[in-house]
């Protein structure tokens, strides 16, 4: 049961990253980090905790970028929150 919930959360994070990577209203560097984050999370040769921590660091750096519009920052914080929940499970 827990694994199914983890998979659902993982799929939701991947979907949100995909949406962000295609959002033309956010800067190109944010879209690239979202795409790189999807790639990193998909690499199953590392533990999920390590992948989540790496992606959290990447997204946190983008969330602190002053050039990111407020709606983009909100999207980043939503993804960060879900990733933290995924890493803890």
Curated annotation (Swiss-Prot):
InterPro entries, per the entry: Ta0600-like_sf (IPR023130), UPF0147 (IPR005354)
Record-linked Pfam families: UPF0147
Superkingdom per UniProt: Archaea
NCBIfam families in the record: PRK04330.1
Family: Belongs to the UPF0147 family.
Protein name: UPF0147 protein TV0625
Protein source organism: Thermoplasma volcanium (strain ATCC 51530 / DSM 4299 / JCM 9571 / NBRC 15438 / GSS1)
């Amino acid at each position: 049961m827990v694994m199914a919930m983890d998979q659902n959360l993982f799929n939701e994070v991947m979907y949100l990253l995909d949406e962000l990577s295609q959002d033309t209203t956010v800067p190109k560097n944010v879209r690239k980090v979202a795409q790189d984050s999807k790639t990193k999370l998909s690499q199953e040769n590392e533990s999920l905790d390590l992948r989540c921590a790496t992606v959290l660091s990447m997204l946190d750096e983008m969330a602190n970028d002053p050039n990111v519009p407020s709606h983009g920052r909100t999207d980043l914080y939503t993804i960060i929150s879900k990733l933290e929940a995924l890493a803890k499970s």
